[in-house]
Amino acid sequence: MAATAVRPITGMLRRGLILDIGIALGVGFVMANGYWYGYHMPRTNARDNYYKKLEEERAARMGA
């Protein structure tokens, strides 16, 4: 049998690796933004509004 040349697969691996990393970073960025603006910020704003209301009620009771 004749020895056949085998094509190097390094280019395919590099392209696949770059694609995988790009997709992972993109999906991670979307998920992080979804968490940050969909859960974290609304909860933080609700907490801040609650304590602001408590402080205003306390100030009104103290007559300040």
Curated annotation (Swiss-Prot):
It is a single-pass membrane protein. It is found in: Mitochondrion inner membrane. Keywords: Membrane, Mitochondrion, Mitochondrion inner membrane, Oxidoreductase, Transmembrane, Transmembrane helix. Residues 37-64 are mitochondrial intermembrane. Residues 1-15 are mitochondrial matrix. The chain crosses the membrane at residues 16-36. InterPro entries: Cyt_c_oxidase_su7a_fun (IPR014368). One of its GO terms (biological process) is proton transmembrane transport. GO terms for cellular component: mitochondrial inner membrane. It comes from the Eukaryota. One of its GO terms (molecular function) is oxidoreductase activity. Pathway: Energy metabolism; oxidative phosphorylation. Component of the cytochrome c oxidase (complex IV, CIV), a multisubunit enzyme composed of 11 subunits. The complex is composed of a catalytic core of 3 subunits Cox1, Cox2 and Cox3, encoded in the mitochondrial DNA, and 8 supernumerary subunits Cox4, Cox5a/Cox5, Cox6, Cox7, Cox8, Cox7a/Cox9, Cox6b/Cox12 and Cox6a/Cox13, which are encoded in the nuclear genome. Belongs to the fungal cytochrome c oxidase subunit 7a family. Component of the cytochrome c oxidase, the last enzyme in the mitochondrial electron transport chain which drives oxidative phosphorylation. The respiratory chain contains 3 multisubunit complexes succinate dehydrogenase (complex II, CII), ubiquinol-cytochrome c oxidoreductase (cytochrome b-c1 complex, complex III, CIII) and cytochrome c oxidase (complex IV, CIV), that cooperate to transfer electrons derived from NADH and succinate to molecular oxygen, creating an electrochemical gradient over the inner membrane that drives transmembrane transport and the ATP synthase. This is Cytochrome c oxidase subunit 9, mitochondrial.
